């Protein structure tokens, strides 16, 4: 059997249809896909439990939460709270489930081909973290977009279970817990300085 390709995602009932389509497209594109799903409410957990797909491992909301997150949840909207949880979800997959590598994917993506080509490129270059840049044009307008939306798009990013990767992941997690709003483009703006790291 081939080595599994580990992914994680999160969504609530408002994104359930998109999440199901994303996961179906991912499994069709990468038959080794194994997806950890943080179920942001019981509707998602119940649906995925009934779905009973061997490519999916559910993480219940109650299993994931702690006192800090419960307190933050009261202060943030649904979208902001989902953004808050992204970095921690990746860390949980790496540390609790002992996966060697994990790629976070947004629930509203659709895969037409195997995304492991990106992960394989990362491995080939001996990198431990991969984030996808927006690739705004090097123009006045492009630079303005980078300032407004951040340099990177966090819809698909990969971390290995290595110390420098975990350190950056923890830094991202702390930033998201401190503030995660439209002003920071959710969890996205915090990744803009990642280009200065080389590992």
Which residues does each predicted region cover?
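Glycosyltransferase catalytic domains, chiefly GT-A lineage
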Residues: 1-199
